[in-house]
Amino acid sequence: MKSSGLFPFLVLLALGTLAPWAVEGSGKSFKAGVCPPKKSAQCLRYKKPECQSDWQCPGKKRCCPDTCGIKCLDPVDTPNPTRRKPGKCPVTYGQCLMLNPPNFCEMDGQCKRDLKCCMGMCGKSCVSPVKA
């Protein structure tokens, strides 16, 4: 097979592989609740992630960080969601290639102490703010 005939085949193969990922979560806006807090325990062996986004989890479950990896877990109600903490989120340079990265928080009120919920390179997480 000539290289010029191979190119269209490779393009079609790539599109066929990526198409299901592109529509993942389409038509769905938001799953209620937030991920439960991680248990303060040491992990001896990390497990392969069960999911990469909420839409890969059945029903109301969300894709959440757990003690030894990322799993589909039952969400909990949002604690004090309206509380906005002082400071600004640090500037993030770059972005991961994951289509729907898991968010470890949605709002400042979900973060402990003075941490803020900020968009990072790969989803939202609780981080130390920079002074405004």
UniProtKB/Swiss-Prot annotation:
Annotated phenotype, changing residue 97 to F: Increases inhibition of chymotrypsin
Gene Ontology terms: biological process: antibacterial humoral response; host-mediated perturbation of symbiont process; immune response; innate immune response; negative regulation of protein binding; negative regulation of viral genome replication; response to lipopolysaccharide
Mutagenesis or variant effect for residue 45 to M/V: No significant effect on inhibition of elastase, trypsin and chymotrypsin
Pfam family, one: WAP
GO molecular function term, any single one: endopeptidase inhibitor activity
Keywords of the record: Antibiotic, Antimicrobial, Disulfide bond, Immunity, Innate immunity, Protease inhibitor, Repeat, Secreted, Serine protease inhibitor, Signal
PANTHER family, per the entry: ANTILEUKOPROTEINASE, WHEY ACDIC PROTEIN WAP
Official protein name in the record: Antileukoproteinase
Gene name per UniProt: SLPI
